[in-house]
Amino acid sequence: MNSLYSVVNTLRDRYAPVSHTSTFRQTGEITPEEFVAAGDYLVFKFPTWSWGDADSESRRASHLPPGKQFLVTRNVPCNRRLNENFAGDAGLEEAVVDDGDEFKGSKGDDDGWLRTGGLSSSQPLKAREVRTVDDAGNAGERAQPDDDDDIPDMEDEEDDEAIIRDTDASGQTSSRRTYTLYIMYSPYYRTPRLYLSGYGANGQPLPPHNMMEDIMGDYKDKTVTLEDFPFFANNIKMASVHPCKHAPVMKTLLDRADAALKLRREKLKTGDASGQQAGLEGLADEFNKLGVSGKGDASKIDKNDEWEDIQHDDVADQEVAIRVDQYLVVFLKFIASVTPGIEHDFTMGV
């Protein structure tokens, strides 16, 4: 079934009509030319990213120039698995976020995104509600949380030599992994699409089912599929984040940024400008509030939240908060919510 799905997706992109009309502000979609411009910006700003070419001319996408068929970054660290211990109880409360007006896809897809993580409404009370029970079944007083001063310091404890294990490299199985990330352009959805190829601590490629260990919650069943990367001849299975919801989510982020920029301009005119930090760093809170990031619902985003301008240029000279050539920087911030164990910021730290 997965192989058939992969073939269908490949044929969709191969035979879908390519639009060269920009609808970036209206739909969150981009044209091939805008994808190249955004890729050039990403490579210029963050040199860990580079352009890649197809293995053969027959595998090239005609709507993209040779040598700029896809973007790639290698050796991205991933040091922890997304098991039940990754986020404590936070990963146990999940809900499917259906398409609303802001997230309704343009291709007729009827599946939503999974919202996972975040404390439940009763979570902060759990520690205070614990009571002791005697042999007769009578409930005692509520247990009081331990004082930090009463917790013994681990450095004061002596190691028992009998339990020290030999950590010889030949017998040790490390949890460290690295990933190669690829970004291609999908003509059918008119958005970028991310592919991931993982490697174990020994440098050997990860089996496809092992890569799914680094995908958050039910995304692995609903949003992420195993597919062949269309530019490579030797059909290597990679994990791919399906782009059916990319455009509406990106449009929501762009609209929020523009609204915040407008508010900032008004404050500048009245001499009441906020001193908050400018730049992409301010995007983190907004992603945490989106349903796709696992921290909340887009409908609950405070429309008065301030997004700062992505550049440090004079605000009065800016028409929009995020330009089309900066699209992929925001896209990667958004897509990191699907694979939080993979250190995406590592690729943008140069």
Curated annotation (Swiss-Prot):
Belongs to the ATG3 family. One of its GO terms (molecular function) is Atg8-family ligase activity. Keywords: Acetylation, Autophagy, Cytoplasm, Germination, Protein transport, Stress response, Transport, Ubl conjugation pathway, Virulence. Residues 248-326 are annotated as: Handle region. Residues 85-166 are annotated as: Flexible region. One of its GO terms (biological process) is protein targeting to membrane. Acetylated by HAT1 at Lys-262 and Lys-267, which affects the interaction with ATG8 and prevents autophagy during both appressorium development and nutrient starvation. InterPro entries: Atg3/Atg10 (IPR007135). The keyword Ribosomal protein does not apply. E2 conjugating enzyme required for the cytoplasm to vacuole transport (Cvt) and autophagy. Required for selective autophagic degradation of the nucleus (nucleophagy) as well as for mitophagy which contributes to regulate mitochondrial quantity and quality by eliminating the mitochondria to a basal level to fulfill cellular energy requirements and preventing excess ROS production. Responsible for the E2-like covalent binding of phosphatidylethanolamine to the C-terminal Gly of ATG8. This is Autophagy-related protein 3. Residues 97-171 are annotated as: Disordered. The active site is at residue 244. Residues 102-113 have a biased composition (Basic and acidic residues). One of its GO terms (cellular component) is phagophore assembly site. The keyword Transport applies. The gene is ATG3. The modification N6-acetyllysine is found at residues 262, 267. The N-terminal region is involved in phosphatidylethanolamine-binding and is required for ATG8-PE conjugation. Residues 146-161 have a biased composition (Acidic residues). It is found in: Preautophagosomal structure; Cytoplasm.
